[in-house]
Amino acid sequence: MTTMGTPLTPNATKVMMLGSGELGKEVVIELQRLGVEVIAVDRYANAPAQQVAHRAYTISMLDDDALRAVVEQEKPDFIVPEVEAIATETLVELEQKGYQVVPTAKATQLTMNREGIRRLAAEELGLPTSPYRFVDNFADFQQAVLAVGVPCVVKPIMSSSGHGQSIIKSLDQIQQAWDYSQAGGRAGGGRVIVEGFIKFDYEITLLTVRHINGTSFLAPIGHRQQNGDYRESWQPQAMSEVALQKAQQIAERITTALGGRGIFGVELFVCGDDIIFNEVSPRPHDTGMVTMASQELSQFALHARAILGLPIPHIEQFGPAASKAIVVEGKSNNVMFVGLDKVLEERGTHIRLFGKAEVNGHRRLGVILARDESTDKALAKVERAYANLTVKL
């Protein structure tokens, strides 16, 4: 029988979020609904999840000593990484000391960089993937591009939201792609993956939740990206039953190998009835924000239940839904949103503003959500709502 304490008392059940972005913010809200005391950590102050947590710390999570110190000070029942840029060796050490890392320190370590997870998927599990090479210098990079062939995709082994990613369509773009990859990695310049370009019909995120009752799959999520970063998503993505079964088999194999409990964002390419593994993140996925409109239990609520060992007997879908990211470009520390009344005037439309105070370049500041009779109608609805929004920088 699961027992929960009360926040801010000696018997509190404590969760520490490592990374406090918009996805972490929704997880914090769901945890607090279940009576959990939450501590939010990030590299900058007043990050979205820190705004709704009981306490917050601002440290470099790549600093072993700083990370260890904040964990040992708070002594959380669960440590929940929300980003890749974390000193994972310290998480392994803390797990060995008895701290519970979600889903596991191994999963966090393997998925923090593309090399670990690609070698697990392709070389250990034998899952279908694109052809690839890993390199850490320009000379080897040139050879890798020639070996894989053009077009090909270049990604730093540690990056997110499309940072440092590019497509090489001709050999005269090799230097430009290398320079961009070295500027975009989470831990600075370094190792990259060169991937063969897959001619896929579409790509999906198959959110997979490992919990005390077993493994459950959410309806597949389709999405559109721009420069490697999510812009729109919809659920469900129509696909054949054969392809869906293959996708679920791949998702179950990779998440079982990673272990632990929680939600996993499994990224897959769909080519007819064939499925090709792309990546997996052991945490909520940005494309999964659509589940805040499409499901009774969003990916964040499911993650919270799985972390705490609470049952997930059924995942009910309300119907077709879509999401559209609110992305701006510029520089400001005084962001304002104009026209929210117009955004929300249509039935079944919702908005989430993340509370990010500063913009310096491209930044995702919120998301618009909608339900309708079909995903096409839901997408049209979020587009109409988006057109009514003005962001002043």
Curated annotation (Swiss-Prot):
GO terms for biological process: 'de novo' IMP biosynthetic process. Its EC number is 6.3.1.21. One of its GO terms (molecular function) is magnesium ion binding. Keywords: ATP-binding, Ligase, Magnesium, Metal-binding, Nucleotide-binding, Purine biosynthesis. Pathway: Purine metabolism; IMP biosynthesis via de novo pathway; N(2)-formyl-N(1)-(5-phospho-D-ribosyl)glycinamide from N(1)-(5-phospho-D-ribosyl)glycinamide (formate route): step 1/1. ATP binds at residues 114, 155, 160-165, 195-198, 203. It catalyses: N(1)-(5-phospho-beta-D-ribosyl)glycinamide + formate + ATP = N(2)-formyl-N(1)-(5-phospho-beta-D-ribosyl)glycinamide + ADP + phosphate + H(+). N(1)-(5-phospho-beta-D-ribosyl)glycinamide binds at residues 22-23, 82, 286, 356, 363-364. It holds the Pfam family PurT_C. The keyword Magnesium applies. InterPro entries: ATP-grasp (IPR011761), ATP-grasp_carboxylate-amine (IPR003135), ATP_grasp_subdomain_1 (IPR013815), PreATP-grasp_dom_sf (IPR016185), PurT (IPR005862), PurT/PurK_preATP-grasp (IPR054350), PurT_C (IPR048740), Rudment_hybrid_motif (IPR011054). Residues 119-308 form the ATP-grasp domain. One of its GO terms (cellular component) is cytosol. It comes from the Bacteria. Disulfide bonds: none annotated. Mg(2+) binds at residues 267, 279. Signal peptide: none annotated. Homodimer. Belongs to the PurK/PurT family. Involved in the de novo purine biosynthesis. Catalyzes the transfer of formate to 5-phospho-ribosyl-glycinamide (GAR), producing 5-phospho-ribosyl-N-formylglycinamide (FGAR). Formate is provided by PurU via hydrolysis of 10-formyl-tetrahydrofolate. This is Formate-dependent phosphoribosylglycinamide formyltransferase.
